[in-house]
Amino acid sequence: MAVTDADVPPPLLDIPKAKEKKYDRQLRLWGIGVTGVEMLKNLVLPGIGHFTILDSAVVSEADLGVSFFLEDASLGRFRAAETVRLLMELNPGVQGHAITEPLETFITKDNAFSPYNLVVAAAPIDASILERIRTHSQILHVPAFYFHSVGYLSSFSLLLPPAFPIVDTHPDSTATTDLRLLRPWPALSQFAKEKTAGLEDGTISAPDKAHIPWACLLLHYLEQWKKQHDGKVPSTYKEKSEFRTLVRAADPNEENFEEAYAAVLKTLNPPTASSAVREIFAAPEAQQLHAASPAFWLIAKAVAQFYAKHEQLPLPGAVPDMKAQSADYIALQNIYKSKARDDCAEVVASVRELEKQTGRSPKQAVDEKEIENFCKGAAHIHLVRGRPFQIAHAGQAITFGDRAKAMAMELTMPESLIGLHVAFLAWDEYVATHSTPASEGGGVGLKVPGSGADDFGTDTQRVTGIAQKIVDCLIKEAGTFVEDPEYSETKNRVGNFCMEIVRAGGGELHNIASLTGGLLAQEVIKVITRQYIPVDNTCLFDGVASRTQVLRI
């Protein structure tokens, strides 16, 4: 069955401005609740572009009691439509859409996922529907989130494409300083030589000495060190400590000498690529390029060629603050910027050659600005290999695959929240096996544990029993054995989580939902902007103990 124009929100027609480009994404939220609304609030305010809520429920008294984005006049109206209307008041520049068709019929339509860049599904949800969402996400390479928020506990899992590269990872500023002091190029060496002239024979004036950039000081004393050590630079911690002593002894009272002393350990490092970066260079996507390869992989291949040739990555070109005359500091900046431009130009030439070799259309030529950004952050690029999130089906064993041993080890760690993940899997399996009329359950056609007046004791036993079974299956799959008292302690921890989520009866506490929605929104923005490194791949929050943990499951 085809999706009509009325069913699918219209695409963006206008050319977006710079700010709009950053957040111009289509987001689909399957099912609405307090956590989902809190997430959307944090996405609408900065300007998500487009969002769609799919929810066939109508607003009830219970909804009014937990959601700040519904009002008395909303009672009896479609929850999705009312939520969209009120959310859009936060930012008129955002386009919101509501689909009130039942999820189980809407998802059977052709191209149901086509307009969207990201999907978020809220528990409880029918396992077969979640399975279809996961499958579509994997086929179309559309990132998908699946979250729980029950009482004081919450979690969310993220399904990313098989290869999800991030260039703009925003590393700590101290980690991005790359001055190449161990491998200076002629222009830098000459500048340092000029600025330190007269330093050894004492002919330099006191003001000039006090304003020598610390990078030049280190280059000067490195030359002295090499003369005394067969041309070798300090490489071990002991040698660097001795070198620091040499620098400080030259003039312990001047600020620039103190800056040079403090910079030794963090700047005198070989310009080698990290193992994570080398893994990206060796990835099949970088080795087997074709005309339709994403720009990231063409640039990665070109930078890999640069690294193989020069044994160093392209120079970022940034210079940290340091005590110096303004003219000298600007001159030093220009030297680094010039070298960075030269390195980038070489990478650009390699990219153009790769485009020719792969038969890439000139209309699809990689933007030079994108290449420049890659070169600046080449030392900190990151690749996430997406994993499908787990789905609990009635009567089917849950497997952990190649993560079984690691997760079995997590089970025995008292501080680990893997037990909470197991409890939510058990919660999902309970939901999958207990269908009821929509008016009686915590979700459409589904019954959540503890939702009935007299269900707490019975449902706690059932959910705990399912969780214990998952624990035993995990230990067996890992091919290991957990002895007492660790085994009993593990089951007790899992049992406590199960009791807590059943006690909540499927209800969401607004403070926990608000926090979880904020976490979700943060990760959504990371994914849609490809900035910072997203969660890989499951985040767990225990509101009772105020603890959070990220696990790759």
Report the location of each language-model feature.
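Adenine nucleotide-associated cytosolic modules
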Residues: 1-553
